[in-house]
Amino acid sequence: MASSTHVPIAAIATAPGRGGIGVVRISGPDLSALARRLFGRELTPRHAHYLPFTAETGEHLDEGIALYFRAPQSYTGEDVLELQGHGGPAVLRRILERCLQAGADLGVRLAEPGEFTRRAFLNDRMDLAQAEAVADLIDASSVAAARGAMASLSGEFSARVNALSDRIVHLRMLVEATLDFPEEEIDFLEKYQARPTLQALAADLATLIAQARQGVILREGLHVVLAGKPNVGKSSLLNALAGDDIAIVTPIAGTTRDKVVQEIHIDGVPLHIVDTAGLRDTDDTVESIGIARTWKEIERADVILHLQDATQPADELDAQIVARLPARTPLLTVFNKVDLLDQPFQAQAGQLGISAREGAGLDELRARLLALAGWNPGAESPWLARERHVHALQRAAEHLEAATEHAAQDDRVLDLFAEELRLAHDSLSSITGKFTSDDLLGEIFSSFCIGK
């Protein structure tokens, strides 16, 4: 997104479709002149004005509320005009066209995706983690995710990152001062307790990484794949977890030919449950395609549930399936149809007995799913996080570890010690956008809707 930030931008800020209220938003330098053209009068900043919205010809397009926010006290840090009218698509398009026409000589143009929030970031109204939280709040699919996004938007995550950054900068400042005045012959590592300071930093960073991983799970959810031979109850389990008849269930082996995906929530965590074609040798062309897709889904899985029929002994095909499952992916072997057994099912380590039809064992299955993915319901994770945040935190941890190795030597390697501290600081700064490439900014903001 290389467009100039010195010209006004305009867009419909509400979601597509019909609604009671729709909003057209304009942001840019000195919009008071545009307001006079649109309404024939001055607008008092931060006051609601009930006015007609008219075309250049005087035709009434709509009537509603106009709000004027003067820079820097606005969402973007620039002057902002918001026109709140009725939420019909045709009405909003006409209001937007009128704004573009009235502001043509001022350079008003259509906004690009995420451009309002990008301007808020560039004008220091929010940092990059908070800007991402705007999109996360819009996309939140559960109350827990919405709360986490709001916590990030309010700056809780950024405050934790900034606190660590400040401590690293302080330590680095002391190192640089020692390097600048070598004649003082100060034993830096001892005088400033560099080693215990590094240990405390590393411990606090490890805690932050663990919390960020929880935030990633809460934001992105888990990709859970149901895999196994035909007719072991994969579709029945999907329906039981979803609480609805999502997948077709018949006693005919091979009923499921293509994947069926359903999103459910457990403790606020979104789970994308994928029912797949049964795994077996077959000459059926269509079924073979479905089986090939099953293996692709298995490769993408965060958690694999390998379903088996508790009423049937494991055979060579079961062993072949297990041998081919990726070792890196958490696995739970689920024996279905335990309600048909004469004796209680005796589960071994890594196994669970359930009845998809009767609902037995499903609560335990839900708890196991979250545990396998690393979700800790008792852990403190008040904010959402992204994979890029975790990677940045991990890079910072690696640089602190390297600094610790240098600190285990003596003051002769202080320059290397200082460099690792600088790199750790840069990694943390990339989270909040204090040290971030334009390519990353473009990637982040391009995922926003146009009105944001």
Swiss-Prot record:
GO terms for biological process: tRNA methylation; tRNA wobble uridine modification. Its EC number is 3.6.-.-. CDD domains: trmE, TrmE_N. Binds 1 potassium ion per subunit. Residues 221-374 form the TrmE-type G domain. It is found in: Cytoplasm. GO terms for cellular component: cytosol. Homodimer. Heterotetramer of two MnmE and two MnmG subunits. PANTHER family: TRNA MODIFICATION GTPASE GTPBP3, TRNA MODIFICATION GTPASE GTPBP3, MITOCHONDRIAL. HAMAP family: GTPase_MnmE. Belongs to the TRAFAC class TrmE-Era-EngA-EngB-Septin-like GTPase superfamily. TrmE GTPase family. This is tRNA modification GTPase MnmE.
